[in-house]
Amino acid sequence: MIDDIKNVSVVIPVYNEEESLPVLIERTLAACRKIGKPWEIILVDDGSNDRSAELLTEAASDPEKHIIAVLLNRNYGQHSAIMAGFQQAVGDVVITLDADLQNPPEEIPRLVEYASQGYDVVGTVRANRQDSLFRKLASKTINMMIRRSTGKSMADYGCMLRAYRRHIVSAMLRCHERSTFIPILANTFARKTIEIDVLHAEREFGTSKYSFLKLINLMYDLLTCLTTTPLRILSLIGSVVALSGFLLALLLIGLRLFFGAEWAAEGVFTLFAVLFMFIGAQFVGMGLLGEYIGRIYTDVRARPRYFVQKTVSAATPLTTSLRDEEE
C-alpha cells in the first residue's frame, strides 16, 4: 500500500438543493471525520434560485465544519461547477460527490482507501441503480458512446462519486475548453484506474436537474467535445450517399433506355423522394459541422468557463493547518 495522502478535499456542486443540504452536510461531515486525515469540504453553488447559497454561506461560517462555500454568479453546469471547486481544493486526493444524496457520502473513506493504494482515479459503479427506466437507458447510451468514441472502457461514466489524485486534478485545471466531461478528461491523464461498486439510493429531496433536453444536450457535448469521430462518420455517410446517387442515376438512365420516356415521367416522385433524403442528410451534416464550429468559436473567445462571485470560509486553510502540524 502506498499511503502518501496527507489531506483530502471533497468537492460537491449544488444547484437548487436547499431541501437536501442540511442532511448532505451532516452526513458528509460524519464521513470525513472517519478518514483520519485533515480534510475540507468545498460546496459550489451553481447559480441556484432557491436558498442553497444562503445555506452554504451559513455552513461555511462555522470554523468547526471545515467548509468552503464557492458561489458562482449564474448557472454554468455541473462540470464547470466542479472545476470551480477543483480550483479551490488543495487536497492530495479530491473526491467529487453529487448533492442529491443518491450516492451516499459514507463511501468517501472507502474511496480514499483505494486512492491510497496508488490509483490515479477511483471510479464507481452504481449498484442496484434507483433511477427511472428512461434515465437508465439514457445513461447506458451515453456510456456506450463514450466507450466507442474514446476507447476507454469504464462501466459507469455518469456516476460522479469519484476520487482523483492531485496530479490528475492539476492536469485537468490546465485544460481550458468550455465543454468538459470530467470523468473522461481525468481518464485521459490517468495511468492507473479502478472502478468499485457503490450503493445507489432513491432521491429523497426534490427532483433531478437533468431533464430530457439537458440529457440530449449532454449527448451532443460528449459527441463534439471529446472526439472527431462523428465528422469521420459523416464523411463516410457522405461517400456512401454519393455512390448510391451515382448508381441510382445509372439505373434510371438504363430504365429510360429500355422502357422509354413514359417510365421516366412516372419516376419523378421517386426522384423527389431520393432527393429529399439526400437534402435531409445534408442538413444533419451541416448541423453537426455547425456544432463543432460553434464550440471552436466559443473556445477562441477565451472567456472564463465560470465566474466566482464570492467565496466564504471561516475554517483555517488546509495547507496552513498542515504547516502548523509540521512545525
From Swiss-Prot:
Transmembrane segments: 233-253, 268-288
Function according to Swiss-Prot or TrEMBL: Catalyzes the transfer of 4-deoxy-4-formamido-L-arabinose from UDP to undecaprenyl phosphate. The modified arabinose is attached to lipid A and is required for resistance to polymyxin and cationic antimicrobial peptides.
One example GO MF annotation: phosphotransferase activity, for other substituted phosphate groups
EC number annotated for this UniProt entry: 2.4.2.53
A Pfam family the protein falls into: Glycos_transf_2
Gene3D superfamilies per record: Spore Coat Polysaccharide Biosynthesis Protein SpsA, Chain A
Places the protein is found: Cell inner membrane
Source organism of this protein record: Pectobacterium atrosepticum (strain SCRI 1043 / ATCC BAA-672) (Erwinia carotovora subsp. atroseptica)
Enzyme class, UniProt record, top EC level: transferase
Protein name from the UniProt record: Undecaprenyl-phosphate 4-deoxy-4-formamido-L-arabinose transferase
Keyword Lipid biosynthesis annotated: yes
Catalytic activities: UDP-4-deoxy-4-formamido-beta-L-arabinose + di-trans,octa-cis-undecaprenyl phosphate = 4-deoxy-4-formamido-alpha-L-arabinopyranosyl di-trans,octa-cis-undecaprenyl phosphate + UDP
Assigned GO CC terms: plasma membrane
Pathway, per record: Glycolipid biosynthesis; 4-amino-4-deoxy-alpha-L-arabinose undecaprenyl phosphate biosynthesis; 4-amino-4-deoxy-alpha-L-arabinose undecaprenyl phosphate from UDP-4-deoxy-4-formamido-beta-L-arabinose and undecaprenyl phosphate: step 1/2; Bacterial outer membrane biogenesis; lipopolysaccharide biosynthesis
Keyword match Lipid metabolism: yes
Membrane-protein topology: Multi-pass membrane protein
